[in-house]
């Protein structure tokens, strides 16, 4: 899947975005802290998630039930209490999934990559900003390779990754920040990496 297609899918999937302020980060929190949002895994929820055919289907169940938990604050990055590079609400969605731990780690690696896209100022095209954007894009390539290594089907990789990006860029400000990052990658190429353990964080 090309970066252009991914960009179009993300922009198309984000509707009713709210305008937000300029803050790029929240106040620092202890790295040992737990995420500020947690979803209770009831027997009914577990059974419902286990009955889904794909990871993306599970994510959609969680989204439909817990959409109000999504952060829509003025902060570009939103709350990350344990400072692991993943917004607390998105981490809560991933933590409740009925998947193996290697798959959960791959999802978090993908979510962390998506979050990092908007953690830097890419409004100006400078040598350093292009270099940073390229570095982040390579992390996304590694996340895709990790998905495949842990056994996630290609269609599920595409759909789950697209949904995580949509959840991450869920305000107008966040979407515009992502587009600023993506603009710096115009004309660049991406090489599909082999599914190897070395690409998993």
Segments the model singles out, each with a brief description of its role:
Residues 2-8:
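Sec-dependent signal peptide recognition
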Residues 13-16:
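C-terminal motif of bacterial Sec signal peptides marking the signal peptidase cleavage site
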Residues 18-83, 89-201:
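Calcium-binding acidic motifs and repeat modules
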């Amino acid at each position: 899947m090309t970066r252009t297609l991914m960009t179009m899918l993300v922009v198309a999937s984000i509707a009713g975005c709210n305008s937000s302020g300029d803050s790029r980060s929240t106040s620092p929190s202890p790295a040992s802290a737990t995420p500020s949002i947690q979803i209770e895994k009831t027997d009914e929820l577990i059974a419902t998630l286990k009955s889904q055919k794909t990871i993306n289907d599970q994510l959609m169940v969680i989204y439909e039930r817990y959409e109000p938990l999504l952060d829509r604050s003025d902060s570009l990055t939103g709350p990350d209490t344990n400072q692991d590079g993943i917004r607390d609400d998105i981490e809560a969605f991933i933590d409740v999934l009925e998947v193996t731990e290697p798959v959960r780690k791959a999802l978090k690696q993908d979510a962390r990559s998506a979050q990092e896209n908007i953690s830097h100022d890419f409004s100006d095209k400078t040598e350093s900003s292009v270099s940073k954007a390229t570095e982040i894009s390579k992390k996304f390539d590694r996340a895709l390779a990790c998905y495949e290594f842990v056994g996630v089907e290609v269609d599920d990789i595409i759909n789950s990754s697209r949904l995580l990006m949509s959840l991450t860029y869920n305000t107008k400000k966040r979407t515009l920040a992502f587009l600023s990052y993506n603009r710096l990658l115009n004309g660049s190429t991406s090489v599909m990496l082999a599914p190897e353990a070395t690409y998993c964080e």
